[in-house]
Amino acid sequence: MTNIVFMGTPDFAVPVLRQLLDDGYRVVAVVTQPDKPKGRKRELVPPPVKVEAQKHGIPVLQPTKIREPEQYEQVLAFAPDLIVTAAFGQILPKALLDAPKYGCINVHASLLPELRGGAPIHYAIWQGKTKTGVTIMYMAEKLDAGDMLTQVEVPIEETDTVGTLHDKLSAAGAKLLSETLPLLLEGNLAPIPQEEEKATYAPNIRREQERIDWAQPGEAIYNHIRAFHPWPVTYTTYDGNVWKIWWGEKVPAPSLASPGTILSLEEDGIVVATGSETAIKITELQPAGKKRMAASEFLRGAGSRLAVGTKLGENNERT
């Protein structure tokens, strides 16, 4: 039987690991990122993949730097015939890439060569795409640049968020892997090189990218909000204080004003001018130091002092 080492870290990777086990493959070890401190008490929390592996009694390795010989040699000690990765979070060294009989394959959440990198789901929505997908490909030393084995398209709905699309792609990736592995192990797949000139990139999200730029068209701001929902969440500022913007809707602008201007205060939201004739109605927000709430609740309380004509985003420095 084929010895498989699975490498993955976040929730996205869990259905992929489960699929391997459900299909009866022998997963001899799981490699994931180290536990991380979270919350106010900074208690160490294990990655979701570690939790899943421990449910099945699978040995778990948590290297801090997989490219260090003493760390990747622990993986090689399990004599993998195949390494399967899904959102692992570290680039593998050549010694690992070359070792398995069937190679190293990766489940990547985009239609490669588009959206290489660590945040392809965010960028697919942020860029207003109507479809994305999953690619299973051989791993190479260059990030997400290996030859492709299989691919499946997944439509992006108008109301999809990074959360809903994440779950769709994770499920699609698990199913695609289930269909791909028998063909790979039987030698019935012809790898397809990626077209480098068509490559685009989706690097990890930076904190400053969470800020809403009200000068952008309303459609782009709507895509930004849903691309960052429910993590890491967009924000704007009002009177020097941060407002996290959890959700908003596109609405026709009732009047023209400079971007960021509050155009109207409605029962269910705050309508804000953008760089186009499409305004954004903020329907769910989290003012600094407060809980997440519906805009209607906010407007009945602390937001009752808001006035039409006030500007959002004047102080763009996040505190």
From Swiss-Prot:
EC number: 2.1.2.9
Binding residues for (6S)-5,6,7,8-tetrahydrofolate: 110-113
Keyword Transferase recorded: yes
Reaction(s) the record says it catalyses: L-methionyl-tRNA(fMet) + (6R)-10-formyltetrahydrofolate = N-formyl-L-methionyl-tRNA(fMet) + (6S)-5,6,7,8-tetrahydrofolate + H(+)
Keywords of the record: Protein biosynthesis, Transferase
Classification via PROSITE patterns: GART (PS00373)
GO molecular function: methionyl-tRNA formyltransferase activity
Record-stated family: Belongs to the Fmt family.
Role description: Attaches a formyl group to the free amino group of methionyl-tRNA(fMet). The formyl group appears to play a dual role in the initiator identity of N-formylmethionyl-tRNA by promoting its recognition by IF2 and preventing the misappropriation of this tRNA by the elongation apparatus.
Name of the protein in question: Methionyl-tRNA formyltransferase
Source organism per UniProt: Geobacillus thermodenitrificans (strain NG80-2)
